[in-house]
Amino acid sequence: MTIFPLPAFNDNYIWIIQDKDSSGIWAVDPGKADVVLNFCHEYQKTLTGILITHHHKDHTGGVAELKQHSNCPVYGPEHLTELVTHPVDDGDRILVFSKVFTVIATPGHTLDHLCYFSEQETPILLSGDTLFKGGCGRIMEGTHEQMLAAMIKISGLPNDTLIYGTHEYTLANYRFALSLEPNNKDLIESNITCQKLRTEEKPTLPTKLSIEKKTNPFLRSHIEALKIQAAQQLNEIPAENPIGAFSQVRRAKDSFS
């Protein structure tokens, strides 16, 4: 199984899953139909499945048109009745080619947000807008408590898990992360690497969970020095509880320029 991105809009990635023994592909969050259809036409592939992480248009906008070209199953949040043929929720399992993906509910960015995890030789997490390289999704519908719970869930996955977020936000995320931890050597090194990748117009994703634990402020909101910096940016006293500390980091990011 291989996974690679098709760029869409300004900074979206439609992740394509393919298997060497199949002419079919799966598309993750196809916000634009023509991107997927053009790929299928050019490489003589057939769309055999769609995974949706949440309802936002840049993740679902191409699904209806793709369904007109393919009778493939569409897995996603159960309330998307016009798009989803196979509604799923936390703990459900989906067979993608020969690999099993387990659904992990991660409300926060949206209330319906789902991630898809496959525990294989190299574990895979399709994280949608919940976790990015160096960042997490803006809290649009959920609560800070819910998003922290999602971060804790993801932190419990194997350290070698490859994380496929759906936006190329890394350099902007790192600018904020470095404002909190300017002396974090892992963060500095990763930022240099990612700047080079973007100069070459290459994606900075996927990332590895072990790297995120060392560099991503939303997986590090328990670190004392980071908490202090986030609170200072908000002109607040550092929170003493985990939810409050995470909230300060998220709100500091929201107002960061």
Curated annotation (Swiss-Prot):
UniProt cross-references to Pfam families, sorted A to Z: HAGH_C, Lactamase_B
CDD domains in UniProt: hydroxyacylglutathione_hydrolase_MBL-fold (cd07723)
Annotated Zn(2+) 2 binding sites: 58-59, 129, 167
One BP term from GO: methylglyoxal catabolic process to D-lactate via S-lactoyl-glutathione
Biological role stated in the UniProt entry: Thiolesterase that catalyzes the hydrolysis of S-D-lactoyl-glutathione to form glutathione and D-lactic acid.
Cofactor note: Binds 2 Zn(2+) ions per subunit.
Full protein name: Hydroxyacylglutathione hydrolase
Listed NCBIfam families: GSH_gloB
Superkingdom, taxonomy of origin: Bacteria
EC code: 3.1.2.6
Record-linked Gene3D superfamilies: Ribonuclease Z/Hydroxyacylglutathione hydrolase-like
Enzyme class: hydrolase
Keywords: Hydrolase, Metal-binding, Zinc
Gene Ontology MF term list: hydroxyacylglutathione hydrolase activity; metal ion binding
Subunit text: Monomer.
Catalytic activity: an S-(2-hydroxyacyl)glutathione + H2O = a 2-hydroxy carboxylate + glutathione + H(+)
Chain sites annotated for binding Zn(2+) 1: 54, 56, 109, 129
Pathway(s) the chain acts in: Secondary metabolite metabolism; methylglyoxal degradation; (R)-lactate from methylglyoxal: step 2/2
InterPro entries: Clx_II_MBL, Glyoxalase_II_hydrolase, HAGH_C, Hydroxyacylglutathione_Hdrlase, Metallo-B-lactamas, RibonucZ/Hydroxyglut_hydro
Family membership: Belongs to the metallo-beta-lactamase superfamily. Glyoxalase II family.
Named cofactor requirement(s): Zn(2+)
